[in-house]
Structure formats: structure tokens, C-alpha cells
């Protein structure tokens, strides 16, 4: 998405290549026009990033640039990231937060962001493994959704295969 070659070490991450932006935005617009024609647009959530490393400045800047690019053509597009925690830099960019279900996304921030119009899903992953202290917490997810007014949970790994099932 940037000028030059990967890994773009010295490239400002908020300056997406104009050609990249143009092609992405055209594709997104065509896709969403199709979804609107079919009556499905209200069922779309754009999953932009899985567990972004927002402790790095370049990741925070890049995410905002990508979300801005999307919102320029689809301002009402829900943008989801399984961020686990809150990243204040992304307020207004991420509109559907993937919050950790075990307290790493503070409840008061969840309430503040919800009041600002953001939506929430609980995200799951490694803490669901059988050898962790959170074993079987998935049984509480429907209750957590009800208690915290969270609309869904992303259950990672339901079809993750580490082998070829056809062999």
C-alpha cells in the first residue's frame, strides 16, 4: 500500500499510495453496491485486522489510514478488529471492537465507546485452550454478551486446520 519495497521501514504509514487507495476504494464501492442491490448491506462487517500489535506506533498510524480510506467511500461501514484491548488512537476508526472477555478491555471504556456509537463483540483465542485457567469460559460468553450488551462473540478456531483433511 506504500511507495517503495516491503517492509517499508522508513515510509510514513499514514500516506497510502494513491493507486492503492483508488483501486481499494473502487473495489469496496462495487462490492457494497452489489450488497445494497441484494439487500444484504446491513449484514456486512469489514474485518480489518486480527490482533493488531498496536503497541507499535506504525501499526496505530497505518490502521487509522486504512480505516479513513474505507470511511471515505463507505462512511457507515462497520469496521471490526479483534484488538482485545482498547486503543484510544482508533476511536472513530474502529467501530466494532473485538474485546477480550476476561477483563482486558475496561468496562468503563466499553460503556464510553458504546455511548459514542461503537459496537462490541467478544473475541476468543488462546485463553480457551485446555491447559489454561480460563478453560470452559466459553460457556459464559452468552451471559457476558447479555450483561455487557455485547452483540456477538467471535469464536476463533472453529475450523482452523493444521493439516490437510483430504489426505
Q: What kind of feature is each model-predicted range?
A:
Residues 1-166:
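Catalytic-core regions of glycoside hydrolase
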Amino acid at each position: 500500500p506504500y511507495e517503495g519495497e516491503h517492509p517499508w521501514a522508513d515510509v510514513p504509514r499514514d500516506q497510502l499510495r494513491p493507486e492503492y487507495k483508488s483501486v481499494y476504494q473502487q473495489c469496496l464501492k462495487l462490492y457494497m453496491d452489489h450488497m445494497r442491490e441484494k439487500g444484504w448491506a446491513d449484514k456486512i462487517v469489514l474485518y480489518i485486522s486480527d490482533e493488531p500489535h498496536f503497541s507499535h506506533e506504525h501499526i496505530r498510524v497505518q490502521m487509522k489510514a486504512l480505516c479513513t480510506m474505507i470511511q471515505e467511500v463507505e462512511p457507515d461501514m462497520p469496521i471490526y478488529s479483534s484488538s482485545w484491548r482498547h486503543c484510544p488512537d482508533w476511536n472513530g476508526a474502529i467501530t466494532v471492537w473485538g474485546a477480550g472477555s476476561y477483563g482486558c478491555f475496561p468496562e468503563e471504556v466499553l460503556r464510553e465507546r458504546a455511548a459514542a456509537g461503537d459496537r462490541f463483540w467478544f473475541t476468543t483465542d488462546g485463553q480457551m485452550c485446555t491447559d489454561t485457567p480460563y478453560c470452559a469460559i466459553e460457556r459464559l460468553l452468552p451471559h457476558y454478551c447479555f450483561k455487557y450488551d455485547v452483540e456477538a462473540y467471535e469464536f476463533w478456531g472453529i475450523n482452523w486446520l493444521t493439516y490437510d483433511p483430504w489426505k
